[in-house]
Design a protein with these regions (language model features):
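Non-catalytic, polymerase-adjacent accessory regions of viral genome-replication enzymes
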Residues: 1-149
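Core nucleotidyl-transferase/polymerase catalytic module
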Residues: 115, 130-346
């Protein structure tokens, strides 16, 4: 049901996307988001210290466009050859345990459009030479699917993720490495630390003590990241956007006892099985949090200098978002416009 509520991915995200390019202009130009903003930003009497998003509420989307562009370009250009290819610690959908995960038999044409097989599919030069002589592997038109699996989350219920095809996981880890390293070496590290949640915990504790900061909790956050949202977030980093699109699986195999296996098309950008899900959603939520806080402070123009002044009051770790308490209303509005759901009960 969550996936059904998301917008259908644009042609840019199709499996046969070769030759297609992104044509998005920004959140403020998307009919879906503009109409959602009008619907959700009802005129209300503001609470003390709040700036209600009323007459100029759509300017909030314009501000978001400027913030996401600053964040995306601050990462610098993405080139796959500059970053490490690897397999993640989890299972993959197409390799039984013990089978060679470096023998890529399902490298699709779509994946090849951003990750050329001859340059990206081999962990060593000897592997490339061996494949050159045997011609055992190469690209295929058909893209492999992911597979829905349950992993432990709580004692009550498991978390559902999708194990990715080995070829896709190999390339997703490359993109993840780029995003982690570029975050750690840029100003974004003042708001995001992918390897340590301590800053979020400290600010959440401070907020619980003096009420100055609030932690916002989302429901099924990764399942609500739409391709439309990702495309608008990374539009100013086209090579990165191409890599995210090419390494994304479009279909998922669902196996359930007593029922016939079925393969479904997914609308969401990815599941938690995709190595890029966490850094991608973190950047989306960071951009929204920064925008909402700037808005609440009365800013209507965006600059990197203004953004950096928010360090110490905004931090994001995945879907764990901490913002000034008086920015929660604008944050909630933006999140809901972008198809996310805030847990108001927590």
């Amino acid at each position: 049901k969550t996936d059904d509520a998301l917008p259908v991915p644009a042609p840019f995200w199709r499996q046969d996307r070769i030759g297609c390019s992104s044509s998005v202009r920004g959140f403020a130009f998307e009919h879906r988001y503009v109409t959602a903003m009008f619907r959700l930003s009802k005129p209300e009497v503001p609470k003390e210290g709040e700036n209600p998003p009323r007459a100029d509420h759509c300017h909030l989307l314009t501000m978001l466009d400027k913030v996401v562009d600053i964040v995306a370009t601050s990462l610098g250009p993405y080139r796959s050859e500059d970053w490490e290819f690897s397999h993640g610690p989890g299972a993959v959908s197409d390799k039984p345990k013990g089978e060679n995960k470096y023998a890529f038999a399902n490298w699709s044409d779509c994946l090849d459009s951003a990750f050329p097989f001859s340059e990206c599919a081999f962990s060593s030069y000897s592997g490339w030479v061996n494949n050159f002589h045997t011609r055992r592997f190469g690209t295929k038109a058909e893209m492999p699917h992911s597979k829905l699996v349950a992993v432990p989350k709580t004692f009550v219920k498991p978390r559902l993720i999708a194990s990715e095809p080995s070829e896709h996981m190999w390339c997703q880890q490359n993109v993840k490495h780029y995003m982690y390293e570029r975050t750690a070496s840029s100003w974004i590290r003042e708001f995001v630390n992918f390897t340590d949640q301590e800053r979020n915990q400290q600010l959440a504790l401070l907020g619980s003590m003096d009420g100055s900061l609030a932690t916002v909790d989302l429901s099924s956050a990764s399942d609500r990241v739409s391709c439309m949202c990702v495309e608008n977030t990374f539009k100013r980093n086209p090579l990165l956007l191409d890599a995210l699109c090419a390494s994304r699986t479009r279909r998922c195999l669902i196996s359930q006892d007593g029922f016939e296996d079925r393969i479904i098309e997914i609308k969401k950008y990815s599941t938690m099985g995709n190595a890029t899900t966490f850094p991608v959603e973190t950047r989306i939520f960071l951009s929204v949090a920064l925008t909402a806080t700037l808005w609440q402070q009365g800013h209507r123009e965006v600059s990197l200098a203004k953004i950096r002044q928010l360090a110490g009051s905004v931090t994001v770790f995945g879907d764990d978002i901490v913002v000034p308490t008086n920015a929660v209303r604008a944050l909630t509005l933006l999140l809901e416009v972008l198809d996310f759901k805030v847990n108001s009960s927590k």
